[in-house]
Every structure is written in C-alpha cells, then in structure tokens.
Amino acid sequence: MKTTAERVKYMMMTLKIKEQTEFGLLCGASKSVVYQWLTGRIKSIDAKYAFKLEDSTPFSARWIMLGEGKIKK
C-alpha cells in the first residue's frame, strides 16, 4: 500500500471501523482530517497521529506514516 488513503482504508477495514469519526478518536484526528486522508488531500499522516494509532491499534507507526516496514508491530 503506497498511499496514505490505501493505508487508512486498510486499517479501518481491518479494525472493522465504518465511521471516520470513530477512526479519528483512535488518534486524536478530526473527522475532517480522516476524510482528507481517505481522499488523498492530505498525503501523509503526522507522527503525532501515527504514534497514537500505534498505541491504540496493532499497526506500526513507521508503516502508518511511510508504508514501509512491518504492517503490524
């Protein structure tokens, strides 16, 4: 998965999350920010969100931000 949008969609699908608001709660992002990740308007996920996601999900921050390394920690 090369794009942020692909990675966010994959995480939401894997975690069985359907609402952007619910995904945002995992990392402290607003629904608007999650929407912009999903549509490609924001091309990358800031470290502050990635590390919060790493803390609350099985996904690694490096993979969340860059699409590199192991998907799961």
Task: Go through each PLM region and give its residues.
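DNA major-groove recognition helix of helix-turn-helix
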Residues: 12, 38, 49, 57, ...
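Short amphipathic recognition helices of helix-turn-helix/homeodomain-type DNA-binding modules
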Residues: 63-73
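DNA major-groove recognition helix of helix-turn-helix/homeodomain DNA-binding modules
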Residues: 47-63
